[in-house]
Amino acid sequence: MNKKGFLDSSSTKILQDLAVAPIDLTAPGVISKERIERFSLSVEGFTLSYATERVDEGILSALEDLASERGLIESMQAMQNGEVVNYIENFPSESRPALHTATRAWVKESPLQGNAEDISLRSKIEAQRLKDFLNRYRDVFTTIVQIGIGGSELGPKALHWALKGCCPSDKKVYFVSNVDPDNAAEVLQEIDCAKTLVVTVSKSGTTLETAVNEELLADHFLKQGLHFQDHFIAVTCEGSPMDDTSKYLEVFHIWDSIGGRYSSTSMVGGVVLGFAYGFDVFLQLLEGAASMDLAALEPRMSENLPLLSAMLGIWNRNFLRYPTSAVVPYATGLEYFPAHLQQCGMESNGKSVAQTGEVIGFATSPILWGEVGTNSQHSFFQCLHQGSDIVPIEFIGFQENQRGKDIVIAGSSSSQKLFANMVAQSIALAKGRENTNPNKNFRGNRPSSLLVSERLTPYTMGALLAFYEHKIVFQGFCWGINSFDQEGVTLGKDLANQVLQVMQGQEKEGALLEAEALLRLFNNIKK
């Protein structure tokens, strides 16, 4: 498809005009029963209410036209089919597919082709190997430690935290990610090494932080008289330095076409979640994600949950020009989910070069951040209600808690109080509250949406994970950027190695000599 650029699309120009005077949420009668019913969508057990977004039918129609002009559904279909979407034209780039959806497509037996079919079949084989491994070793160990950084930690950790409230387990789970040795030392203080399985996750098999932490843990195990091969397994790409069954108890595979931040439904998340909660729980997670993958192919924006949410985000970012966006889950189980979304969104779409290789002249990823409610109401919500910047908020909530333990006080349960707080915040941000005292005046017109499901389960967590993955990817397609590389991460690794050369007194070509003065300054700090 020969698509116009984002700024050249006719719908973009229409939306720019509409953004001059968008709907006023504070006007009497705007947040009506009819609007709430009309501006909602239910898909795969989730209901999205966007009545408190600054949109009307005209804006929604123009957003749908923009999605069509930019070929978003065609691009999503191409990605799921295994076409090359990770590329920059006319410049060296990774030039490969993005096949995270194939890691779970096999559970639905979805018809695939080419690269997607290959990765789906391989993922099914790896899942069966994991099931066999768990049958042999899950009862041998009481604890698992996952070593990995970025997508090898943030996604699996968020999923583990989400499942622990609904899936009984007698296993202990820890993550070591930071190269700061205190991270590993803290975990080592907590575990019985003789009963611990360690899974090292690195696609390349050479990730600096991961290699250092593996060596640190291996040394500790050795000093306790334990053999590396009896306790350490690996998740890595075929042919990497870690792909060595003579060294590890077992090696599970992932592939270059699956980006770290999108890898939680591969063995990157499968091993630790399968060990903690059992293979069937991991399978339920995959089923939820695979269902949302199919839902993301619905051609109508009004019926496509991730596409609708993506375009609402485009409206807020590019036309209302809000620079940040908050995700606030009203569920303790999603405590680490905003951190995962922060990486997934900002590493994917924090770009200023189009796939054509041209520098772009419009905003891309907002700054993503968040925290669970109601805790967040007592930390940063003051700024959201009365601060000088408007921050769109995505609320996530559930009608039931996970653990089933609750109490009724003053006529309502704790779960009801939690849900009431979430709904109240959305309405308060939209409508505001007038007061003659300017310090108590709330101007309102602060947009938000609510995404609600019945209960946080493995299935709904899988669907929620995939929902946000697709939302982020849809936005990248709309902007015409590459959502699947991360050159900024690569730069940081390269420069750190150059600084280390200076610290070690190595005058090699490429050493970052500019760091010498800084290092000298800090070395003079008195102890």
Swiss-Prot record:
<dbReference type="InterPro" id="IPR046348">
    <property type="entry name" value="SIS_dom_sf"/>
</dbReference>
<dbReference type="GO" id="GO:0006096">
    <property type="term" value="P:glycolytic process"/>
</dbReference>
<dbReference type="GO" id="GO:0051156">
    <property type="term" value="P:glucose 6-phosphate metabolic process"/>
</dbReference>
<dbReference type="GO" id="GO:0048029">
    <property type="term" value="F:monosaccharide binding"/>
</dbReference>
<feature type="active site">
    <location>
        <position position="378"/>
    </location>
</feature>
<dbReference type="GO" id="GO:0097367">
    <property type="term" value="F:carbohydrate derivative binding"/>
</dbReference>
<feature type="active site">
    <location>
        <position position="493"/>
    </location>
</feature>
<protein>
    <recommendedName>
        <fullName>Glucose-6-phosphate isomerase</fullName>
        <ecNumber>5.3.1.9</ecNumber>
    </recommendedName>
</protein>
<dbReference type="InterPro" id="IPR035476">
    <property type="entry name" value="SIS_PGI_1"/>
</dbReference>
<keyword id="KW-0413">Isomerase</keyword>
<comment type="similarity">
    <text>Belongs to the GPI family.</text>
</comment>
<keyword id="KW-0963">Cytoplasm</keyword>
<comment type="pathway">
    <text>Carbohydrate degradation; glycolysis; D-glyceraldehyde 3-phosphate and glycerone phosphate from D-glucose: step 2/4.</text>
</comment>
<dbReference type="InterPro" id="IPR035482">
    <property type="entry name" value="SIS_PGI_2"/>
</dbReference>
<keyword id="KW-0312">Gluconeogenesis</keyword>
<dbReference type="InterPro" id="IPR023096">
    <property type="entry name" value="G6P_Isomerase_C"/>
</dbReference>
<keyword id="KW-0324">Glycolysis</keyword>
<dbReference type="InterPro" id="IPR001672">
    <property type="entry name" value="G6P_Isomerase"/>
</dbReference>
<dbReference type="InterPro" id="IPR018189">
    <property type="entry name" value="Phosphoglucose_isomerase_CS"/>
</dbReference>
<dbReference type="Pfam" id="PF00342">
    <property type="entry name" value="PGI"/>
</dbReference>
<comment type="pathway">
    <text>Carbohydrate biosynthesis; gluconeogenesis.</text>
</comment>
<feature type="active site" description="Proton donor">
    <location>
        <position position="347"/>
    </location>
</feature>
<dbReference type="GO" id="GO:0005829">
    <property type="term" value="C:cytosol"/>
</dbReference>
<dbReference type="GO" id="GO:0004347">
    <property type="term" value="F:glucose-6-phosphate isomerase activity"/>
</dbReference>
<dbReference type="GO" id="GO:0006094">
    <property type="term" value="P:gluconeogenesis"/>
</dbReference>
<comment type="function">
    <text>Catalyzes the reversible isomerization of glucose-6-phosphate to fructose-6-phosphate.</text>
</comment>
